[in-house]
């Protein structure tokens, strides 16, 4: 009997550990790699030329009145990758009339009427939450943005 319970607990532990979904998206020039893990939290990390520059960092939101909070125990329904190579007309005058807009975009479509969009450019990476909530207004109580930089890294803050 004890052996059956032990085997059952091991099987449950393996199933739970497999639950975490991992996604990777690269910059168009393949120098920047963004890794995303959707488990108890939404975690991202960034590598540049194979060297880790952002260690695993959590991102999440707390929206008033929602049962499912973006980034907390995320359930990814679908993942979509788009490669964009376009030119935008410069609104603010710069040397060139147009600005090249080239990036790889990963959209994680999640249960709970929200998506997380990651964009990886040749010179950086960004994310944003996108909702399709029908309630109005939407009140964001808080947003968690961890930026766990590597030791010895310098950051310039405005």
Model-derived segments and their meaning:
Residues 1-22:
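Bacterial Sec-dependent N-terminal signal peptides
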């Amino acid at each position: 009997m004890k052996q059956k319970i032990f085997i059952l607990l091991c099987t449950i532990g393996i199933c739970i550990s497999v639950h975490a979904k991992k996604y990777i998206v690269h910059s168009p020039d393949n120098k920047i790699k963004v890794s995303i893990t959707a488990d108890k939290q939404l975690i991202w990390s960034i590598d540049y030329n194979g060297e880790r520059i952002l260690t695993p960092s959590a991102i999440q939101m707390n929206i008033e009145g929602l049962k499912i909070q973006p980034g907390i125990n995320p359930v990814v329904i679908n993942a979509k990758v788009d490669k964009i190579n376009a030119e935008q007309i410069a609104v603010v005058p710069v040397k060139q009339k147009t600005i090249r807009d080239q990036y790889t975009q990963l959209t994680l479509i999640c249960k709970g009427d929200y998506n997380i969009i990651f964009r990886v450019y040749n010179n950086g990476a960004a994310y944003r939450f996108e909702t399709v909530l029908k309630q109005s207004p939407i009140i964001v109580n808080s947003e968690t943005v961890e930026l766990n930089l590597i030791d010895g890294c310098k950051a310039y803050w405005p």
